[in-house]
Design a protein with these regions (language model features):
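Intrinsically disordered, low-complexity Ser/Thr/Pro/Gly-rich regulatory segments
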Residues: 1-215
Length: 215
């Protein structure tokens, strides 16, 4: 049996703003490309985001630009007001990706008896916890998955990032451990890595970072 427990520390400020962004993106599908470009070019630096955003916003004209685009730009302009440092900035990036993904996961698993986001996975009441032998900049303890669902017979788990460059060794190693524990209990399952880039680019980045093999 699979159950879930809350793992992520709640940050209401970031959660609410991330939901606003996700609603705006789902309303106009073209906005995901804008958001993806801005976040990719900004990387992990909040200060860099301001420079990238200002450059993107410069050609916009209040009289000629579509009102919905100006509205979206106004929302994007709040990022460095909502976030006070790079740690919050990187947390927000992840929460936005999860919020955009959640409605699709909800619809896909509408009948699941167990479902959760940012949760610990418990198999027969035993939590799956990854603890590396040596902690490095990319490999550290991990004990949660971004999205999980269980219908009583089969489980599905998803790790979500805006860009494949955001995946770290700890993410992959945790999912490998999770798969091992599921196999030991003979539980049918699927595990996905989800990004907002195309499949081939995602694969190429993960292979280049030695996070997946060529199979």
């Amino acid at each position: 049996m699979i159950t879930f427990e809350s793992s992520d520390y709640p940050n209401p400020k970031l959660e609410v703003f991330a939901e606003e962004i996700s609603v705006a993106v789902r309303k106009y599908k073209s906005r995901i490309a804008i958001l993806n470009t801005l976040l990719r070019q900004s990387g992990s630096s909040l200060q860099r985001y301001r420079l990238v955003f200002n450059k993107w916003k410069m050609p916009l004209n209040k009289r000629k630009s579509p009102p919905d685009l100006l509205e979206f730009a106004s929302l994007l302009d709040q990022f460095d007001t909502i976030c006070t440092n790079d740690e919050e900035w990187n947390k927000l990036r992840g929460v936005i990706a999860e919020k955009i993904f959640e409605p699709y996961f909800e619809q896909r698993h509408a009948d699941a008896c167990e479902k959760g986001y940012g949760v610990k996975v418990l198999i027969d009441n035993v939590p799956v916890k990854y603890r590396p032998k040596q902690i490095t900049s990319t490999d550290s303890p991990r004990q949660s998955v971004d999205a999980g669902a269980w219908n009583g017979e089969q489980a599905e788990f998803v790790e979500i990032k805006f860009s494949p460059t955001a995946f770290q060794l700890k993410d992959i190693n945790y999912l490998k451990l999770l798969e091992t524990r599921l196999d030991e209990k003979h539980i049918q399952h699927t595990i996905y890595l989800a990004t907002f880039n195309d499949i081939e680019f995602t694969k190429s980045v993960l292979k280049a970072d030695n996070l997946i093999d060529d199979s």
